[in-house]
Amino acid sequence: MATYMSTICFGSFECKLPYSPASCGHIVKEREVPASVDPFADLETQLSARLRKQEYATVRVLKNGTFTYRYKTDAQIMRIQKKLERKDREEYHFQMAAPSIVSKITIAGGDPPSKSEPQAPRGIIHTTPKVRKVKTRPIIKLTEGQMNHLIKQVKQIMSEKRGSVHLISKKTTHVQYKEILGATRAAVRTAHMMGLRRRVDFRCDTWTVGLLQRLARTDKWSNQVRTIHVRRGDSGVILNTKSLKGHFGRSSGDLFIVRGSHEGKLYDARSRVTQSVLNSMIQFSNADNFWKGLDGNWARMRYPSDHTCVAGLPVADCGRVAALTRHSILPCYKITCPTCAQQYASLPVSDLFKLLHKHARDGLNRLGADKDRFIHVNKFLMALEHLTEPVDLNLELFNEIFKSIGEKQQAPFKNLNVLNNFFLKGKENTAHEWQVAQLSLLELARFQKNRTDNIKKGDISFFRNKLSARANWNLYLSCDNQLDKNANFLWGQREYHAKRFFSNFFDEIDPAKGYSAYEIRKHPNGTRKLSIGNLVVPLDLAEFRQKMKGDYRKQPGVSRKCTSSKDGNYVYPCCCTTLDDGSAIESTFYPPTKKHLVIGNSGDQKFVDLPKGDSEMLYIAKQGYCYINVFLAMLINISEEDAKDFTKKVRDMCVPKLGTWPTMMDLATTCAQMRIFYPDVHDAELPRILVDHDTQTCHVVDSFGSQTTGYHILKASSVSQLILFANDELESDIKHYRVGGVPNACPELGSTISPFREGGVIMSESAALKLLLKGIFRPRVMRQLLLDEPYLLILSILSPGILMAMYNNGIFELAVRLWINEKQSIAMIASLLSALALRVSAAETLVAQRIIIDAA
């Protein structure tokens, strides 16, 4: 065993000791190495599908700046993988291909880039270069003294004229000088003055506070003000804190901006208040009282609406238009000023009309471009301007009439004096005075009629009434705006409204019956043959010429029956036409046309395409309603806006009075009535009117012409000439002739007899009920039904089920909306039926409750 020496030191002494290390045995043992475990293996397995999608995803940026993945779909990923595999496969085949020698490299087969090219000469620019000089404007800078002087001058000027100053920092502060608390003081616009309720009513920065301190120092800035004197309308006024006496809250900057009071304590608008104080605070704004009065009475005083109101107009624009309307009707400088109200009330009626007329015209000018949005305000102002337009009263004429007959009180001078006084008052006449004036005019008409004697002059043998060879100029058929590219007349909206004529007064021609079934037109004392059969044109020329001859019917010669006279003078438009020798012009064969309206009796006739009906079939007027073609011709001169009202008036006002087989006088009278409503029809051309003296009938020629010939021809070619028949003083046999066919073919629309009988003009009662049931679940059918036959609504009372179904589908509300401005009676019927439906629903509920109670 080996011996070793060990050295031990004790201070400076060194001691060496021998020692032998013990031998140790070595045991060899294999160490167990723990198996490595990947902690993310399971996670990678779970996220493999997501990582696979993220591998092919792209990055996009949202509107808020967030970066997100835009993942591909499985189909897109499959296509990308196939593309990569194809690329790797092509690269592998390229690498494994046999070597090849490259002898030449080109770019698309062109010259190499190193080849030099000649330099092309550049073009010469024949322009003068523009030298733009930037002008530097000096920045205006004011010293502190100059700025203070400017603020002082602005304050003095604005306080004298009670103007306003805008302080623009981060926010704009509006300073207004007003007469408040016995002095001109500065006031700011707080939040509650603009309709906003906030805990802090007014906010401003330090710079704004400094300017407010200088702008608020007006003449009586140091005068003492008590809080009990501050009242409504003083919101926003800036007071001196040092001069303010009473119970008030905290403030800063020696400024107190009035907001309101709570439990007798005055609060600064810059102070933050609690929510409970805010809810119960009395704010000193005039707007509060105004809006309180408006909101409290608006809902109570408004009228019921036939629709669901929505907020479709901007509130600010509504407020501006409300102010415009207020100044147009009740002009004043301040709405709270009693002096303005007294001055308005003390105006004479004539001066008030002039004032309203001027302000209504100014209101229309101020409305400007907003008239398309506020169409109701525009229409009101136009009506107000028209109704208040001053009348130019000629006092000299009044005095002259009064000097002549003023002292005479017997008829007819009494009636003339009444009219003279009526015209002097102008638009100040009351409804009773209008009625008295009309009665006076009636008495004058009767007096003149009784006084006038018809004097017979001349001999009928000298009567001549030639028909002009020139056609009348029709402006409405010559206007380019109403013609298409083929120069055909465009009906526009009139075509839709003309269906009221076709559905009630025309029959569809059934091709199965043939044209021969419609050739004979019956009239009270005979028949007339139409040329509708000639629509089938024979190819044989001789046969065609034979059909062109017509069926001649001999008429008596020219006599008193052919003439119309007044005061002994002939009224030529109301007479039959003659030749140069005095014999009557006899009608010839009039060929038929398809779907045309034929107008004009002088020169060449005009063919206008008929409006389209409900089908493509031909239409022919019902027996006895030939005169409907006159109103259809008048529709050409009616504007598209008035077409609906015109057709309804003809259907509901004219036709019920005329019925079938009306006299020429009655037809002319209804035309005169329509001319008052629609002045444009005065020059409307009429279809040719044939006179049959044997049967005392006037025939209105339609598009199917006339096979019967030999009739006399009436000269009247326009509505204004036809209206001449509507005169009791006119001596004429023709005005008593009948126009139309048999009277029992079509009942009058205004008759009290039920129109649902079999063979009636509309339909049977069962057919009408079926149509009503069909329209309940078809809105388009129901809307058309309400427009054409609104009184079918009454049939809903036959069944509670029908009544409830119509109510649940809103049909009664639709009827009210359609007729509220057209015919109040129909709207009232719809409202009553709606109320009845509610009662039926309540009754059914009560019956169900009774059954449940009895069963219990």
UniProtKB/Swiss-Prot annotation:
The active site is at 192 (for p1 proteinase activity), 201 (for p1 proteinase activity), 235 (for p1 proteinase activity), 626 (for helper component proteinase activity), 699 (for helper component proteinase activity). The keyword Hydrolase applies. InterPro entries: HC-pro, HC_PRO_CPD_dom, HC_PRO_CPD_sf, Pept_S30_P1_potyvir, Potyvirid-P3. One of its GO terms (molecular function) is serine-type peptidase activity. The record marks 284-285, 740-741 as: Cleavage. Keywords: Hydrolase, Protease, Serine protease, Thiol protease. Residues 618-740 form the Peptidase C6 domain. A motif (Involved in virions binding and aphid transmission) lies at residues 592-594. The keyword Coiled coil does not apply. Its EC number is 3.4.-.-, 3.4.22.45. One of its GO terms (biological process) is proteolysis. It catalyses: Hydrolyzes a Gly-|-Gly bond at its own C-terminus, commonly in the sequence -Tyr-Xaa-Val-Gly-|-Gly, in the processing of the potyviral polyprotein. Residues 141-284 form the Peptidase S30 domain. It holds the Pfam family Peptidase_S30. A motif (Involved in interaction with stylet and aphid transmission) lies at residues 334-337. PROSITE patterns: HC_PRO_CPD, PV_P1_PRO. Belongs to the potyviridae genome polyprotein family. This is Genome polyprotein. The lineage of its organism: Viruses, Riboviria, Orthornavirae, Pisuviricota, Stelpaviricetes.
